[in-house]
C-alpha cells in the first residue's frame, strides 16, 4: 500500500491548495460554481446550492471553477460578486490563497513531525562517508578517504548528532571551491587529519563523496514549546533550500535539469518512505507542499504567479490586458506545462526497474 499512501499524500496537498482558493473566494462572497479534486472522468459529484463538488479519476491535480468563464451561467455579467468584477486586492487574495494554504499546512506538518514523531538524530557525532564518487570528483579518493570514515570536523567546525550536520558539511564543501579544507577524520580508533581542496563545479565545490548519518538514527519528540521554534527553523530551511534549487535550475540549467522530478518520481520516493520510514512522511509531505507553493508562485503562465503578474500589470496600467493576449499567454503556458508533465511521466516510467515491481508495491 506504499504507493497508494504516497498518492494519498499528493492528493491531500493538492486538496489543501484548492481549498485555499475556494475558502478565500467564498469568504469574500465571490461566486464559485465548481470544486474538483483530480482531473478526467467524474467518479463522484454533489451539487450544492451554488457549487458542484467532484472527485475525478486522476487525483494528481484539481481546480476551482468560477462562473466568469461559464457561457451557460445564469449570473449576469455585471454581477459584483463575479471574480473578474472584484477589486484587484480581492482577486489577488483568491489567487494567492492556494500558495498560502500550502505553506501553512507545511508548517503544521513540520510541527507534527517534531512534536509527535520526533527529530532524527544520529547515535554518534560526526558525518559518515557512505561512498566515494570519483566519477563526480576524485578529490576525496586521491586524499585517501574511504567509505566508513567519519568526518568529525571541517576547518575546526565540529559536527554533532543532528541530521543537519550533513547539510552543514555539504555547504562548507560547496562554498569552498579551490580552497583548502582541513578535515578531522575517524577511522576505527585512529584520528586522521586530511586536507582536501574541493574541485570547482558549476553548482559549487565538490570532492566526490556520499554522506550519511553516523550510526543509527533515532527520533526524539520535543516539547510543545520547543516544537514551534524547531518547526519554524525547519520550515525556513526548506523554503530557502527550495528557492536555492530553483535558482540553480535557472543559472545552471544543464546540470540541474536532470534532477527535476515529475509525479512518477515523487510517488516513487514517497512510496519508498512509506514502506521503509513512515516516520518521515510528515517531512516528505511538508517538503512537497512547500515545493508546490513555490512552483505556483513563480510568474509563469497558467500558474498562480502568472495570474498575479497579470494583476500587477493591470494595477500599473489602470486596466487589464486585452483578453486575447491573456488567453494566448495562458494557453501557451498550459501547453508547455502539460508537455513538460507528459515528458517527465514518460521518462520516469521508462526508468522504473520493471513495471511488475511498481504494480507489486501497490499491495505492499
From Swiss-Prot:
One of its GO terms (molecular function) is metalloendopeptidase activity. It holds the Pfam family Peptidase_M50. PROSITE patterns: PDZ, ZINC_PROTEASE. Belongs to the peptidase M50B family. The active site is at residue 18. Keywords: Cell inner membrane, Cell membrane, Hydrolase, Membrane, Metal-binding, Metalloprotease, Protease, Transmembrane, Transmembrane helix, Zinc. The keyword Calcium does not apply. The lineage of its organism: Bacteria, Bacillati, Cyanobacteriota, Cyanophyceae, Nostocales. Coiled coil: none annotated. Zn(2+) binds at residues 17, 21. Residues 103-188 form the PDZ domain. It is a multi-pass membrane protein. This is Putative zinc metalloprotease all3971. GO terms for biological process: proteolysis. One of its GO terms (cellular component) is plasma membrane. Its EC number is 3.4.24.-. The keyword Signal does not apply. The chain crosses the membrane at residues 92-114, 281-303, 329-346. It is found in: Cell inner membrane. Its cofactor is Zn(2+).
Amino acid at each position: 500500500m506504499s504507493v497508494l499512501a504516497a498518492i494519498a499524500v499528493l492528493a491531500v496537498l493538492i486538496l489543501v491548495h484548492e481549498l485555499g482558493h475556494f475558502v478565500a473566494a467564498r469568504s469574500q462572497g465571490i461566486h464559485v460554481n465548481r470544486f474538483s479534486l483530480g482531473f478526467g472522468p467524474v467518479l463522484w459529484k454533489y451539487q450544492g446550492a451554488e457549487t458542484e463538488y467532484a472527485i475525478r479519476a486522476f487525483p494528481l491535480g484539481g481546480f476551482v471553477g468560477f462562473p466568469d468563464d461559464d457561457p451557460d451561467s445564469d449570473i449576469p455579467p455585471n454581477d459584483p460578486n463575479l471574480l473578474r468584477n472584484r477589486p484587484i486586492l480581492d482577486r489577488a487574495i483568491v489567487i494567492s490563497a492556494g500558495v498560502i494554504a500550502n505553506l501553512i499546512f507545511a508548517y503544521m506538518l513540520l510541527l507534527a513531525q517534531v512534536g509527535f514523531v520526533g527529530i532524527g538524530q544520529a547515535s554518534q557525532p560526526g558525518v559518515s562517508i557512505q561512498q566515494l564518487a570519483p566519477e563526480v570528483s576524485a578529490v576525496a579518493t586521491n586524499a585517501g578517504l574511504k567509505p566508513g570514515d567519519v568526518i568529525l570536523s571541517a576547518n575546526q567546525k565540529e559536527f554533532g548528532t543532528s541530521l543537519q550536520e550533513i547539510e552543514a558539511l555539504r555547504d562548507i564543501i560547496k562554498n569552498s571551491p579551490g580552497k583548502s579544507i582541513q578535515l578531522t577524520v575517524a577511522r576505527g580508533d585512529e584520528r586522521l587529519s586530511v586536507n582536501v581542496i574541493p574541485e570547482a563545479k558549476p553548482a559549487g565545490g565538490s570532492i566526490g563523496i556520499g554522506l550519511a548519518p553516523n550510526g543509527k538514527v533515532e527520533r526524539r519528540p520535543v516539547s510543545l514549546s520547543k516544537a514551534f521554534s524547531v518547526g519554524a527553523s525547519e520550515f525556513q530551511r526548506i523554503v530557502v533550500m527550495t528557492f536555492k534549487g530553483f535558482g540553480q535550475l535557472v543559472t545552471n540549467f544543464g546540470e540541474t535539469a536532470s534532477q527535476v522530478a515529475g509525479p512518477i518520481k515523487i510517488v516513487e520516493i514517497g512510496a519508498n518512505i512509506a514502506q521503509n520510514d513512515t516516520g518521515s512522511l510528515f517531512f516528505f509531505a511538508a517538503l512537497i507542499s512547500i515545493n508546490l507553493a513555490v512552483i505556483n508562485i513563480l510568474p509563469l503562465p497558467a500558474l498562480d504567479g502568472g495570474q498575479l503578474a497579470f494583476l500587477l500589470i493591470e494595477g500599473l496600467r489602470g486596466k487589464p490586458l486585452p483578453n486575447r493576449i491573456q488567453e494566448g499567454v495562458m494557453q501557451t503556458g498550459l501547453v508547455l506545462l502539460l508537455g513538460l508533465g507528459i515528458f517527465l511521466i514518460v521518462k520516469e516510467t521508462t526508468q522504473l526497474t520493471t513495471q511488475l515491481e511498481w504494480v507489486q508495491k501497490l499491495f505492499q
